[in-house]
Amino acid sequence: MNLLATLERGLADIDAQGLRRRRRIADTACSAHMSVDGREIVGFASNDYLGLAAHPRLIEAFAEGARRYGAGSGGSHLLGGHSRAHAALEDELAAFSGGFSDAPRALYFSTGYMANLAALTALAGRGATIFSDALNHASLIDGTRLSRANVQVYPHGDADALDALLRACDAPTKLIVSDTVFSMDGDVAPLARLVALAEAHGAWLVVDDAHGFGVLGPQGRGALAAHGLRSPNLVYVGTLGKAAGAAGAFIVAHETVIEWLVQRARSYIFTTAAPPSVACAVSASLAVIASDEGDARRAHLAALIERTRAILRATPWQPVDSHTAVQPLVIGSNEATLAAMAALDAQGLWVPAIRPPTVPAGTSRLRISLSAAHSFADLARLEAALVTPIEAAA
């Protein structure tokens, strides 16, 4: 069998379904206005929700961190790679996002994917049962698979269905896992119900706040803080490459949980630590997020969200009822969605097309990601340009 020919047939099948993904090349820093593939565009593709990726304070902190610590960490966190910058950042993250716990501690990871794998594989295993929302992020799904636990998927956001599954389960360890803000729909999980169910059934509750951290709650402290939730059963995962404008992720939980992860989480133990300079940039980001400037950026973003919702409601397509920076516009077929994306691109607007398997078949969509770096003039351009995709996709 020709191995390359097998892959080529698979790629041809991907093309036939309109599912080929392509990388675009950014020539400038992430921002609302940037150069991509040699063209000036207004970007609605990034997750830089507060517009901090090119913030001078973060850039200077990163540069100073590199001057002090060098370009790389030199090892894993347990074998020489854990710097003073990493340790200080973990203390800051625990204080910032750990209000749900009486004894919070944080653990910093190089990526959100690794953090989710760590939480699920270290807290659940053979004999445990994980209850996973049907629309959870791929990293959570992979974490459930790698855990070797029994996995039960409950209908999206359906706390009553989850309750029934928990009542019927006699596993010694139960773990509920959910995104807070769902990345492709922009809706928010019923977090208060999930916390109540976790406590009623003696289950862990792992929440991935990738799209809520920095944006939701007082001072951007996240979705749990937005709802005033507290519980010893909570394990909070936050991402630092979206609203925080840098890179990496973290877990905050009771100090005993974090110590268990240090000892048992393979995706933490067996990998090189992120460069200390990144931790320095994140520390600077936290200061901005919690400041008056952070409040102003969140207020501007909230106004942009409401204006975008009004714009999308005026199209003949199906906007998802999202009050977050993720604003999806469901078109349907892959072909129509790609045509809409191309028409927007021709007018200097980068709005990505999201297709299966990321979303269910027949629900391909434009995913409009908003940033505090956007202006209302940017939204006016988007509103005017949507006429062309409508005609192209009709």
UniProtKB/Swiss-Prot annotation:
<comment type="subunit">
    <text>Homodimer.</text>
</comment>
<dbReference type="Pfam" id="PF00155">
    <property type="entry name" value="Aminotran_1_2"/>
</dbReference>
<feature type="binding site">
    <location>
        <position position="239"/>
    </location>
    <ligand>
        <name>pyridoxal 5'-phosphate</name>
    </ligand>
</feature>
<protein>
    <recommendedName>
        <fullName>8-amino-7-oxononanoate synthase</fullName>
        <ecNumber>2.3.1.47</ecNumber>
    </recommendedName>
</protein>
<comment type="similarity">
    <text>Belongs to the class-II pyridoxal-phosphate-dependent aminotransferase family. BioF subfamily.</text>
</comment>
<feature type="binding site">
    <location>
        <begin position="112"/>
        <end position="113"/>
    </location>
    <ligand>
        <name>pyridoxal 5'-phosphate</name>
    </ligand>
</feature>
<keyword id="KW-0808">Transferase</keyword>
<dbReference type="InterPro" id="IPR022834">
    <property type="entry name" value="AONS_Proteobacteria"/>
</dbReference>
<dbReference type="GO" id="GO:0030170">
    <property type="term" value="F:pyridoxal phosphate binding"/>
</dbReference>
<dbReference type="InterPro" id="IPR050087">
    <property type="entry name" value="AON_synthase_class-II"/>
</dbReference>
<feature type="binding site">
    <location>
        <position position="137"/>
    </location>
    <ligand>
        <name>substrate</name>
    </ligand>
</feature>
<dbReference type="InterPro" id="IPR015422">
    <property type="entry name" value="PyrdxlP-dep_Trfase_small"/>
</dbReference>
<feature type="binding site">
    <location>
        <position position="358"/>
    </location>
    <ligand>
        <name>substrate</name>
    </ligand>
</feature>
<comment type="function">
    <text>Catalyzes the decarboxylative condensation of pimeloyl-[acyl-carrier protein] and L-alanine to produce 8-amino-7-oxononanoate (AON), [acyl-carrier protein], and carbon dioxide.</text>
</comment>
<feature type="binding site">
    <location>
        <position position="211"/>
    </location>
    <ligand>
        <name>pyridoxal 5'-phosphate</name>
    </ligand>
</feature>
<dbReference type="InterPro" id="IPR015424">
    <property type="entry name" value="PyrdxlP-dep_Trfase"/>
</dbReference>
<dbReference type="GO" id="GO:0009102">
    <property type="term" value="P:biotin biosynthetic process"/>
</dbReference>
<keyword id="KW-0093">Biotin biosynthesis</keyword>
<keyword id="KW-0663">Pyridoxal phosphate</keyword>
<dbReference type="InterPro" id="IPR004723">
    <property type="entry name" value="AONS_Archaea/Proteobacteria"/>
</dbReference>
<feature type="binding site">
    <location>
        <position position="183"/>
    </location>
    <ligand>
        <name>pyridoxal 5'-phosphate</name>
    </ligand>
</feature>
<dbReference type="InterPro" id="IPR015421">
    <property type="entry name" value="PyrdxlP-dep_Trfase_major"/>
</dbReference>
<dbReference type="InterPro" id="IPR004839">
    <property type="entry name" value="Aminotransferase_I/II_large"/>
</dbReference>
<feature type="binding site">
    <location>
        <position position="21"/>
    </location>
    <ligand>
        <name>substrate</name>
    </ligand>
</feature>
<dbReference type="GO" id="GO:0008710">
    <property type="term" value="F:8-amino-7-oxononanoate synthase activity"/>
</dbReference>
<feature type="modified residue" description="N6-(pyridoxal phosphate)lysine">
    <location>
        <position position="242"/>
    </location>
</feature>
<comment type="pathway">
    <text>Cofactor biosynthesis; biotin biosynthesis.</text>
</comment>
